Design a protein with these regions (language model features):
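Bacterial lipoprotein signal-peptidase II cleavage site
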Residues: 19-40
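A bilobed periplasmic-binding-protein/Venus flytrap-type ligand-binding module shared by bacterial periplasmic
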Residues: 148-153, 268-280, 299-302
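A ligand-binding cleft/hinge motif common to bilobed small-molecule-binding domains
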Residues: 108-114, 231-254
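An extracytoplasmic/periplasmic, membrane-proximal ligand-sensing/linker region
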Residues: 202-204, 308-346
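Periplasmic-binding protein-like
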Residues: 176-183, 208-212, 219-220, 251-275, 290-312
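Extracytoplasmic ligand-binding site segments that recognize negatively charged/polar headgroups
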Residues: 51-62, 82-85, 99-227, 231
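Short, polar/charged alpha-helical segment
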Residues: 40, 45-78
Length: 346
């Protein structure tokens, strides 16, 4: 996830309104490097070509492209990338009539659509995931939350490093922290899930609201914003994606990461096949299988969260307290948490 901006919008019965505002769309065609006229007529090839709609970052698209090109699908697919809300909106508006054969999207979106409209087919030859997952999606990448500090600014500010996310609500951290806004970033939802799991929804919402108040001008719409503020020396403490802070520390920056006592919560993005009945692309299932089987090693380099049995990551990329929210993650639950936090801050 290059952290795409999120906006809280109402989710109607048709789910036409979605909430994560992302970047604009572009097209990345997997068939541009291959021979367009190899063995089939263009019309026949087009009929079998797999259209993939994705909200993934450039690194993830590149990894999936490498996997497909190296395993017999060069020239047999087209990627089209969208912001999360844009892709969610297309799925809501078009349903099974959408052009895409395969979608990759945040799992809470996929689950919400499946619950409402049964948009996705059960996957064949699905690899075994570490955490239980439904039959209609398979994860492609995961992101885990953590606290991080600029060690130099922390010392200059004469602050103790926090042990918990809740510590950031203390008066001494006011003006010294940067966190993502629950209304603007899915990364903030990781922070909110952690605090609500530890304190309950009502008390947790008050804590998150107090943290946002302490952040002041450093309350960021982008999930990557807090770490950027720490790199620039504009804040001492922040919350964001753990692997990004690990990478900064490895590069020699004065950044360190802290696994909060509330836990390291996780969000996943996954691939699913659009169920179009008899019109379902016969190659779609194989494309998803190849992305997972051959794309995961490269994806792990950019998103070092083990998702499948047998996968391993380096010691520094293993969170001390891996955690998952007690309820299934859905768009509706995110909206509920957004409202609860903002109401608590009034």
């Amino acid at each position: 996830m290059n952290l795409k901006k999120l906006l809280a919008l109402g989710l109607s019965l048709t789910m036409a309104a979605t909430l994560v505002a992302g970047c604009g769309s572009n097209t990345n065609a997997g068939d541009t490097s291959g021979d367009q006229t190899a063995d089939k007529t263009s019309s026949d090839k087009s009929a079998q070509q797999v259209i993939i709609y994705s909200n993934a970052d450039d690194e993830a698209i590149t990894a999936m492209t490498h996997a497909l090109d190296s395993n017999g699908y060069q020239g047999q697919y087209v990627f089209q990338t969208f912001g999360t809300s844009e892709l969610g909106g297309k799925l809501a508006a078009e349903g099974k009539n959408i052009e895409a054969d395969v979608v990759t999207l945040s799992t809470y979106y996929l689950d919400s659509f499946q619950k409402k409209e049964k948009l996705f087919a059960d996957l064949q030859n699905k690899a075994k995931t570490i955490q239980p997952s439904p039959s209609y999606w398979t994860p492609i990448l995961g992101n885990t939350g953590a606290l991080f500090v600029n060690t130099e600014v922390l010392k200059q500010s004469k602050l103790e490093a926090p042990k918990s996310i809740a510590d950031l609500a203390k008066p001494e951290y006011a003006g010294h922290i940067s966190v993502p806004d629950i209304m603007g970033s899915s990364t903030s939802w990781l922070m909110t899930q952690a605090v609500m799991s530890a304190q309950g929804e009502e008390a947790g919402a008050k804590t998150v609201a107090a943290i946002e108040k302490n952040a002041g001008a450093h309350l960021e719409k982008s999930g990557s914003g807090p770490l950027k503020k720490l790199r620039a020396g504009e804040a001492a403490v922040g919350f964001g994606l753990r692997h990004q802070a690990v990478a900064d520390k490895a590069r020699g920056l004065p950044i360190d990461y802290i696994d909060p006592t509330e836990g390291n919560f996780q969000l996943q993005e996954a691939a699913a096949v659009v169920d179009k009945g008899a019109k379902t692309n016969p190659n779609a299932q194989k494309v998803v299988e190849i992305i997972v089987k051959y794309g995961r090693p490269e994806l792990l380099k950019f998103y070092p969260v083990a998702l499948y049995e047998g996968e391993t990551v380096s010691a520094e990329n293993k969170p001390a307290r891996p955690s998952f929210y007690k309820e299934p993650l859905t768009v509706e639950l995110l909206q509920k948490h957004q409202k609860t936090v903002k109401d608590a801050g009034k």
